[in-house]
Amino acid sequence: MAALKKNDRLRLSVETLLGNGNGLCHTDEGFVVFVPHTAPGDIIDAHIIKVTKSYAVAKTVEIIQPSPYRHEDGCPFSKNCGGCTFQHISYEKECEFKENTVNDALSRIGKLDLKVEKFYGAKNSCSYRNKAVYPVGMSKEGKAISGFYASMSHRITEHDVCRISNPVFSEIRDGVLQFINDRNIAGYDEENCTGIVRSIHLRSSKNNEISLTLVLNSKELLSSSTERAFVKFINKSFHEVVTILINVNTKNTNVILGDEWRTLYGDGYIYDEISGKKFRITPASFWQVNREQAEVLYSVAKEYASLEDGESLLDLYCGTGSVGLCIAGNGTKLYGVEVVEEAAKDASFNAKLNNIDGKFTALPTENALDDEYVKNLHPDVITVDPPRKGCVGAVEKIAALGAKRIVYISCDPATLARDLAEFEILGYKAIRASAVDMFPRTGHVESVVLLSQQKASAGTDLS
């Protein structure tokens, strides 16, 4: 066969899935072809839309023979929306794929003799998200529109409802759009940095109390009378909304929230509950989006930490304190580190709210670990829950604290495996691993790993 060209048509068999939801295929000559929205075992008639030196991308013209794992009762918007990855396959196959992804990273990247001992799938793969951020833009007809970004773009795709979010979120978003369109308030134009409303930010608690934040392009763009009318409209239309805020973000950036906040109504925060603990949550705070699975995650972390009465716990990348507060035992001495100042304040408040003795500082973890006070804590257990990039610049400093056990919670199997390999060189062996599906229907998976301090044998240099 001649070299593959754009617009070629050919039959392909889908071999496996990738984390972005694309199916992996090979031509008869062994050339790699990626096909979105396919399932392992699909046989398809494919149309080549892009060719590079090392791979091609195709779209499905027809499914000649569907995979036994194909699941067509998914979201009607998933092919255009960039939010979900696996709406088109069975949930059982999705869980299998995610478990394999973690195991592959541990063995291939970390070179570790360790496998996931249990994968915790979600009981509910729909309506689980307690947070939504809807970008707002303008239609060709000059009306404000909102939805989610299309895959790999900043083009807004409109939709009626999101299957994985709290169902009332879409109703509130539509109400906000109605209000701003009735008053000819412009959505944001990302190319020209013009317009008023950039996004609609929603959060809900266990008892369905909701915080609503409008992210604006300038603090001067809504009059006080418009703000009062907005509060009145929301109060009348959506009794679940207990607080309304304005956030100002004038920067030409992908960062959603700016630094300036104003509370129009309510307290500016909501209270949520996980594992019997109560938490104050502000719109800017990191908070797990899947409450049910967060309880599973923290239960595993608590088992791995095995804190005894009176032991000390250092909670790194602690956010609003949820990990440390949920796994703390009787008399646990808790110290937390969090880079976001408001989140660290929330963590301190949440410790008092739950009658737990905790001290929290607002610093980047790698900087806090240079502090003499932290160096002299001598924690019995350390928990880490870093961002996707992992514990960059901190692994050696964490190991130097000499804790008996480290519990590593990760949202990225690749950086987890990389860090575990470094910890092993420094005397901490990964001995147990579990995976929790915090984000059903997406390509993301959460992992929990227990590392145990290894006694150095004679002649062993761990420096």
Which functions belong to the PLM regions below?
Residues M1-F77, T365:
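Terminal RNA-binding accessory module
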Residues L202, N208-S218, K278-T282:
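Short, aliphatic-rich beta-strand segments
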Residues E117-S125, E190-E191, V197-S199, A435-M438:
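Short, solvent-exposed loop/turn elements at beta->coil junctions and helix N-caps
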Residues C126-N130, K206-N208, G443-H444:
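A short, glycine/Asx- and small/polar-enriched loop/turn
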